[in-house]
Regions:
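Intrinsic-disorder/low-complexity peptide segments enriched for small residues
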Residues: 7, 23, 56, 82, ...
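Ubiquitous "structural anchor" signal
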Residues: 20-22, 118, 169, 245
Length: 314
């Protein structure tokens, strides 16, 4: 997907998120209606065997059969007992007619395991609700192996699927008052690699820094080149750094998807002031050049990349 077609997305499970910009997709109290109502708060106990929060960053390009060219959505799921609560915000697609959870790996169409809704939603860019899932084995699999499942949205124009994404488990303990998520996409970004001597005496490109501008004016770099850690700074002074806790490959030629534990390093109020976890998803490009490099001829290379960053407030 062309990054210029992306916008900010926000949604919440167990929390109401206010719109923070005209381009934001959010669940807000003012937009509640009789058939699309922000869900009541869900309690997520520390024992992950009993409860969990999952997130999916849906893209049209993730569909096996081409989906909406600029389709994008952000979806949160809460599992508590045999109840699965969902909240989804979307843009770049028509109003969804159906939403499901499927069993299946990336690039593979799989069977529906949980129908979320099977009738058209009202216009408004979001939907939420809860379904009962009596299959305890399925719920256990969603918690223990979320990457083997994907979420998708269907529309009239794309009945086979407008946007989809694999599920990801949030790893940070979630406050019992609920969880909310904000998605910002890279507008312009590069993974920066330096030609460094390796233990065997050869030279190869290794991670040096990152430089990316995200929608919403967030600037993404390393706190210190080489040693890091990565950081995200909002225009309002709020900021977080991240420590990688999980890494998943995303195909040849693409940097890995990451799950990072967030540490507050900026202002106590602002866009990122309540972020506890960051996910880097839907990565495209950014991989270091392979082979031997010459530190005199090419000491530094900037490799363009795209990604969606999900900021979790807990």
């Amino acid at each position: 997907m062309n990054s210029s077609g992306k916008r900010r997305l926000a949604c919440g499970v167990g929390a109401v998120v206010a719109a923070v910009a005209s381009a934001t997709l959010a669940i807000s109290a003012a937009s509640a209606s009789s058939d699309v109502t922000p869900p009541a708060g869900i309690t997520v106990p520390a024992d992950s065997a009993r409860g969990a929060i999952l997130v999916a960053s849906l893209e049209g390009r993730n569909e096996v059969t081409a989906g909406a060219p600029v389709g994008q959505a952000l979806e949160l799921f809460g599992i508590q007992g045999n109840t699965l609560t969902y909240s989804v915000a979307w843009r770049g697609i028509g109003t969804p007619t159906e939403a499901h959870l499927h069993a299946g790996a990336r690039g593979v169409d799989g069977p529906v395991v949980v129908p979320l809704f099977t009738t058209p939603r009202r216009a408004g860019g979001f939907a939420s609700g809860a379904v009962t899932v009596p299959d305890s084995t399925l719920l256990a699999a969603l918690r223990s192996d979320p990457g083997s499942f994907y979420a998708d949205l269907h529309t009239t124009n794309f009945p086979g699927g407008a946007a989809r994404a694999q599920l990801h488990l949030l790893t940070h303990p979630v406050a019992t008052s609920g969880v909310a998520a904000l998605q910002e996409s890279v507008v312009l970004g590069s993974q920066i690699y330096a030609c460094i001597q390796q233990p065997d005496g050869s030279f190869a490109f290794t991670q040096h820094d990152v430089a990316a501008h995200l929608i919403g004016g967030i600037h993404h770099t390393f706190v210190q080149p080489v040693t890091g850690p990565p950081q995200w700074q909002a225009p309002d002074g709020s900021a977080v750094s991240g420590t990688v806790v999980a890494k998943n490959g995303n195909g040849a030629g693409n940097i890995a998807e990451l799950n990072l534990d967030a540490t507050q390093i900026g202002a106590s109020t602002g866009l990122l002031s309540h972020v506890v976890e960051v996910l880097r998803l839907n990565t495209v490009g950014g991989v270091a050049p392979t082979g031997v490099c010459d530190p005199q001829a090419t000491p530094i290379v900037n490799v363009p990349y795209q990604a969606d960053y999900i900021f979790i407030n807990g």
